[in-house]
């Protein structure tokens, strides 16, 4: 039937390119639907060594026998060790510790990301910091400061069309904006705070906005 044909197509796409995340995610989800959790885990682990991706983490968690927070932390640690220096492995550990309410370890992981990757701070990490401050201390002032900063730092990675710059959260074969085929790649979109009369980025203005928040947030850590 249609479901069997779709499964075969997912498998063919995954077999042809283990680094093609959309195909791997679709095939892993199909395996999970069939109850083949171990195969799905193995597939994601192979792809994680080549192209870690946040959507694969969500699917990986679905292969677990239990939703227990500590078990999920252990599972995520195993996955992240496959590609330990990649930013997605580091963020995966943060997300697992936050979900398990292990605030101290989550803070330690976030601080490590900042120290190891000077340009890593983006809107996603700001939101994780906000979640930590609200969850650990109930400090809404710090949480709101981080959420404010999320609006002015670089956007988190997304699927970006190489032809027109259209940005979408989930991969599509055709760009809905320009109609390009297979033009999406996973990367950070260009971030422009504003343009001056000459059409150039307002870099001084964006810096003026960012500095008070930088000072405020550093004083709060």
Regions found by a protein language model. Name each.
Residues 1-173, 177, 184-200, 204-221:
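Repeat-based scaffolding regions
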């Amino acid at each position: 039937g249609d479901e069997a044909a779709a499964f075969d197509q997912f498998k063919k796409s995954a077999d042809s390119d283990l680094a093609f995340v959309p195909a791997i995610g679709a095939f892993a989800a199909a395996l999970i639907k069939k109850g083949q959790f171990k195969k799905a885990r193995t597939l994601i682990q192979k792809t994680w060594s080549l192209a870690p991706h946040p959507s694969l983490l969500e699917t990986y968690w679905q292969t677990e026998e239990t939703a227990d927070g500590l078990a999920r932390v252990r599972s995520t640690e195993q996955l992240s060790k496959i590609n330990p220096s990649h930013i997605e492995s580091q963020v995966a550990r943060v997300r697992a510790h936050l979900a398990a309410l292990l605030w101290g370890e989550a803070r330690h992981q976030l601080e490590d990301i900042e120290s190891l990757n000077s340009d890593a701070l983006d809107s996603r990490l700001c939101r994780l910091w906000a979640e930590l401050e609200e969850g650990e201390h109930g400090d809404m002032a710090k949480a709101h400061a981080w959420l404010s900063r999320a609006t002015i730092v670089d956007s988190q990675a997304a699927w970006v069309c190489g032809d027109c710059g259209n940005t979408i959260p989930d991969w599509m074969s055709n760009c809905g904006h320009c109609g390009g085929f297979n033009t999406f790649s996973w990367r950070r979109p260009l971030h422009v705070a504003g343009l001056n009369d000459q059409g150039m980025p307002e870099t001084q203005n964006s810096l003026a906005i960012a500095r008070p928040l930088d000072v405020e947030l550093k004083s709060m850590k």
